[in-house]
């Protein structure tokens, strides 16, 4: 599945998830279970119709699973892009704030007050990025 590979290559694969299930890695099986039932010559009556209905529903569920997995992988890739953009924005804002503070400090304060402010600023914890964890 191509989106899953892209997600892994981008380093955005959710931890602890493991590999994709075999049912989503390989193409669906060809053929029809009804053909096997007919060739065996067994008289199954209503069981044949029930098996065919179950087979069809399993195929529908597999298609939905593949579609949902593709959408989740696409969302994971978008979240990775947004995270990178957020890091860039936060870094730019931090640089702007530092420049503004430097200009204000230089205009309004003496040397002792500048040192006090630098010490107090270093005691604040660094801004942390939100954790955009994803679970599939």
Curated annotation (Swiss-Prot):
Region (Disordered) location: 92-136
Residue spans crossing the bilayer: none
Biased composition (Basic and acidic residues): 101-121
S-S bridge residues: none
PANTHER family linked to this entry: GLUTAMATE-RICH PROTEIN 4
Official protein name in the record: Glutamate-rich protein 4
Organism: Mus musculus (Mouse)
């Amino acid at each position: 599945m191509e989106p899953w590979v892209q997600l892994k290559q981008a380093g955005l694969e959710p931890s602890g998830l493991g590999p994709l299930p075999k049912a989503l890695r390989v193409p669906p099986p060809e053929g029809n279970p009804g053909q096997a039932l007919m060739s065996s010559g067994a008289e199954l009556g209503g069981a044949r119709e029930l098996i065919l209905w179950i087979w069809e529903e399993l195929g529908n569920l597999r298609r939905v699973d593949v579609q949902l997995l593709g959408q989740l992988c696409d969302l994971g890739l978008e979240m990775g892009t947004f995270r990178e953009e957020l890091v860039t924005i936060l870094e730019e804002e931090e640089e702007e704030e530092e420049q503004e503070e430097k200009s204000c400090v230089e205009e309004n304060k003496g040397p002792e007050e500048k040192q006090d402010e630098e010490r107090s600023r270093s005691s604040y914890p660094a801004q942390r990025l939100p954790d955009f964890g994803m679970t599939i």
